Swiss-Prot record:
Coiled coil: none annotated. Its main location: membrane. It is found in: Cell inner membrane. GO terms for cellular component: NADH dehydrogenase complex; plasma membrane. Keywords: Cell inner membrane, Cell membrane, Membrane, NAD, Quinone, Translocase, Transmembrane, Transmembrane helix, Transport, Ubiquinone. This is NADH-quinone oxidoreductase subunit K. It comes from Bordetella pertussis (strain Tohama I / ATCC BAA-589 / NCTC 13251). Its EC number is 7.1.1.-. PANTHER family: NADH DEHYDROGENASE SUBUNIT 4L-RELATED, NADH-UBIQUINONE OXIDOREDUCTASE SUBUNIT ND4L.
Amino acid sequence: MTLTLAHYLILGAILFAIGIFGIFLNRRNLIILLMSIELVLLAVNMNFVAFSSWFGDIAGQVFVFFILTVAAAEAAIGLAILVLLFRNLNTINVDELDRLKG
C-alpha cells in the first residue's frame, strides 16, 4: 500500500481539527493552549510539504522552514510568558495575564 496525497491531507486535517478543538476546549491552561497552536502549525506544515511533493515544487518545503522559524520564536516567547506568569502569580491560568503589569 502506498501513501497518496489524500492520506497526508486527511492526517493533516485530523491534526488541525485536534489543535482547534484543543484551543476551544481549554482556554485557561497556557501550556495546552501553546501545544494546540503548535499542533495547528504542524498540520499546516504537513499539508505544505504534501502539496509541494505532489506537484514537484520545492517552494512549499522552503516555506515550511520559515513557518518553523516563526513557530520556534512563538514557542520561546510563549514559554517565557508562562515562566513569568508562574513566578509572579503561581498559576498558569490565561485569565490571570491581565494581573501582570509592567
